[in-house]
Each structure stands twice: as C-alpha cells, then as structure tokens.
C-alpha cells in the first residue's frame, strides 16, 4: 500500500483545495472561538447562565420510616422508652424513632409492609398507603402541628387571585 504522501506527488495542493485555503486561519473562519456569535453555527448557546437553582431555604430534608419498621419494632421501642404501650395499643412518635430525624426537617411514615397490631402514630407526614394500613389495623395516624401547616400549604394553589 502506498502512503498518502506518495499518492499525492504531482498534486499542487495535496488535497487542500485551492492554493488560498491553507494560508492562515481564514479558511477555518478564524482561530479558536472566533465568530462564535456571528458566522459559526452551533446547536446550543454556549455563553451565559442556564437553568434554575432552587433557593436553599425552599429545600426540605425528609426522614422516612416504614410502617413495617414501626410494627416490628414496637415492643423494642417500648423497652427503649421511645414509645408507650397502653390499652393494647402502641403509641409511637415517629420523630423519636426515625434514624435521621434529628438532622431532617420532616419525618414521614411510608406504607411499605404490613401492620399486625394497633398503632397510634404521630408524624409530620404520612403516605396514603401508610395511613390506610395503620387505620385498617385499628390505629390512628396523627399529624403534628408542623405537618398540618405543610399539608395546608400543599393544598393551596400558588398565585391564586379570585378578585378578577
């Protein structure tokens, strides 16, 4: 096989087009990022800020605990004095039990698993499944004051003006 250099012997420009094309950067439209806003074509705007950054004050961290963890650990929680057993039912505050509840803003009970005993649970938020499982077993799911204010805030529509 012959080399490219050998094949192009006798050719004046060696595949570079006309004699003007390989002189300077003019054939390429300038050097580097020259012409980025004028004569260069691009599929995106590479200059400036893009997107949205959520304000840190609007972010909430959520500590999650499942109803199965509450159900299976109810007797242990009573032994550790983080819950109470009264009239055949366990009274549990999920904020005292969730692993990362101290460092989070909200404690939420999720509906993963089964509930076999009567639980009266206090938490900032409940999933619909968790609330149903707890109440079907004869217990109750009670929101904290913080949880009630969060629930009211989610039900309201933002920027609702009824004056028009």
UniProtKB/Swiss-Prot annotation:
Keyword flag Lyase: no
Acidic residues: bias regions: 153-164
Basic and acidic residues: bias regions: 34-43
Keywords: Ribonucleoprotein, Ribosomal protein, RNA-binding, rRNA-binding
UniProt key word Magnesium: no
Comp. bias intervals (Basic residues): 1-33
Record Pfam families: Ribosomal_L27A
Location of region: Disordered: 1-59, 137-164
InterPro entries (alphabetical): Rbsml_uL15_N, Ribosomal_uL15, Ribosomal_uL15/eL18, Ribosomal_uL15/eL18_sf, Ribosomal_uL15_CS
GO molecular function: rRNA binding; structural constituent of ribosome
Gene Ontology CC terms: large ribosomal subunit
GO biological process per UniProt: translation
Function: Binds to the 23S rRNA.
Family of the protein in this entry: Belongs to the universal ribosomal protein uL15 family.
HAMAP family reported for this sequence: Ribosomal_uL15 (MF_01341)
Subunit structure as annotated in this protein's UniProt entry: Part of the 50S ribosomal subunit.
Protein name listed in UniProt: Large ribosomal subunit protein uL15
């Amino acid at each position: 096989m012959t080399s490219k250099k050998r094949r192009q012997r006798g050719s004046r420009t060696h595949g570079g087009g006309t004699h003007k094309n390989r002189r300077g950067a003019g054939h390429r439209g300038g050097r580097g990022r020259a012409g980025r806003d004028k004569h260069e074509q691009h599929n995106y705007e590479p200059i400036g800020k893009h997107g949205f950054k959520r304000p840190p004050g609007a972010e909430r961290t959520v500590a999650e605990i499942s109803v199965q963890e509450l159900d299976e650990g109810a007797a242990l929680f009573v032994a550790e004095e983080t819950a109470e057993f009264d009239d055949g039912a366990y009274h549990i505050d999920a904020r005292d039990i969730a692993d990362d509840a101290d460092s989070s803003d909200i404690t939420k009970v999720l509906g993963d698993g089964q509930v076999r005993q009567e639980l009266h649970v206090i938490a900032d938020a409940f999933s619909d499944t968790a609330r149903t499982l707890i109440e079907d077993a004869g217990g109750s799911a009670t929101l904290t004051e913080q949880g009630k204010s969060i629930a009211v805030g989610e039900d309201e529509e933002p920027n609702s003006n009824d004056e028009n």
